[in-house]
Curated annotation (Swiss-Prot):
Keywords: Transferase. The keyword Ligase does not apply. Belongs to the CoA-transferase III family. Frc subfamily. GO terms for molecular function: formyl-CoA transferase activity. The active site is at D169 (nucleophile). This is Formyl-CoA:oxalate CoA-transferase. It catalyses: formyl-CoA + oxalate = oxalyl-CoA + formate. Involved in the catabolism of oxalate and in the adapatation to low pH via the induction of the oxalate-dependent acid tolerance response (ATR). Catalyzes the transfer of the CoA moiety from formyl-CoA to oxalate. CoA binds at residues 17-18, 38, 72-75, 96-98, 104, 137-140, 273-275. It comes from the Bacteria. Its EC number is 2.8.3.16.
Amino acid sequence: MSTPLQGIKVLDFTGVQSGPSCTQMLAWFGADVIKIERPGVGDVTRHQLRDIPDIDALYFTMLNSNKRSIELNTKTAEGKEVMEKLIREADILVENFHPGAIDHMGFTWEHIQEINPRLIFGSIKGFDECSPYVNVKAYENVAQAAGGAASTTGFWDGPPLVSAAALGDSNTGMHLLIGLLAALLHREKTGRGQRVTMSMQDAVLNLCRVKLRDQQRLDKLGYLEEYPQYPNGTFGDAVPRGGNAGGGGQPGWILKCKGWETDPNAYIYFTIQEQNWENTCKAIGKPEWITDPAYSTAHARQPHIFDIFAEIEKYTVTIDKHEAVAYLTQFDIPCAPVLSMKEISLDPSLRQSGSVVEVEQPLRGKYLTVGCPMKFSAFTPDIKAAPLLGEHTAVVLQELGYSDDEIAAMKQNHAI
């Protein structure tokens, strides 16, 4: 089966989550992704949060499927030579080291261009070069804090909160992926590679664009009418936290369902659409609200929006969350059950669609991992297990023209 990136070679100089999530997607699209790891150690996530002693952790296996792994010590002369040969044959190199680290290894962007002018160099950093935080070490929650997500997440009477979703890490990887694919297309026109940089702060901010919208509205109006604080609460000079309220102008909230007393996920998310208000009233047994001036418009409803949600909850609390969604969907009401990760891991529809897949690694055995979220009509990504540390070192070196004796000597010299 032909794949979009068949014949594209990627050097994966990344670790943890932001970089590996990007290069894993490139591998799913058919690229030959070679993960370059420190001899005897490898990516730090191989050892983090292990559930089986001395076996690659799920943290690693779920971010590095379909790749090849080589152990390479780029501090040695032989290791640098191998690296230069890899760069000469590669289409893309991706790194997410601390600022300046890859330069100190001897592989500046200028030197890389000399070796291979067609190479596309993808780089992830916590902050842009012009940021005052450029040298701050960044991880997931650091990026969420600096990108505007934490300050706008949580309840108005509580502290900022970080999201469980990887807005700082995997989201940054997906943003870089888009940039790399654009650079590949640009190379078709120009014949030259380019550097693509992505900061984690920028990636988070890009998902917080509606909050930047709200900041400008707040600056002009002094209030935000779709937030729970309106009209009885107070607004400061920055976008506040809105709890579970919808952020797109449609009021929404988390509502209890049957069993909520013992099941922490017995809830649904319920959205009130202006254009669907009549159906909403019929669904919850309040037809009189359709024409009542206190309820008939979004502006009229906002002062007592929580009373409305409380009334809706009187119904949802009597039935199972799945039954509630099935019933409300008949009235075209946007809603969804709050699904636990246990439910998601067992969901047959996600297995059928390939969004959750089971793969097998030689030492770990079978495990679940996320599949490709995009579905294509012309090909289906074949999700394979993550590589063992250095599993492909000899093969990759042989492809570069090294003999068995040379490979053995490099091993003896701790270059691999």
